[in-house]
């Protein structure tokens, strides 16, 4: 998959992952039924490969005359994205090492594949060349979308919303389409009809962080302590936090309501320090 834009690098990768995941979702849950039940033919088998190359490892070229031209890219990572696509199984997404390292994706979204014809020997690398051993992972797009709170939200249920504060203290909704900067104040809130909110008996907020920074600080998973909430926070079912670590992080809200109902709601939030993430990139130094 090839994306070229003026977005921040983290946001370009995030939007590539989001686009690929939605493509797979639409194919698996909508197009498949149409092809098989209406058209009476086999459904599409979509394979997607995503990789990322930094500015100094990608050469953009434009060929042609006047308004008849073509933009093309030359890069090891453009070739690797094609190879990743070839490695992908039907209706799956393969990502290169720079993708999951740059965003510090959680381990539970990533898995190894097996060497073709073997059920025991894993295939870790999309490329092995002396000192340049470049890893690949299968990306669990289904689980990823399940944890994006607004993706399959519907009326009549509890919804988790997240807002971040602008410079003028205005609340802006966050939709997992980009990374927030570190030290950004954010607010999670349960939203639903008043009749549904009145049925809530208790709420527990659990932070699930990912990445090298959170691991070093031993703050990967923890329940937000009761003393972190004001009476007003508890009354309106909100949780105030701030961003601190690179990675894709989850807020997990456990809601207990009348009728012996328990629901666990996820919200996915990206945080990225692009300067730090650049140090995670694997550079090709081929002879």
Q: Which positions does each model-derived feature cover?
A:
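Catalytic beta-strand-to-alpha-helix segment of the class III nucleotidyl cyclase homology domain
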Residues: 6-126, 131-135
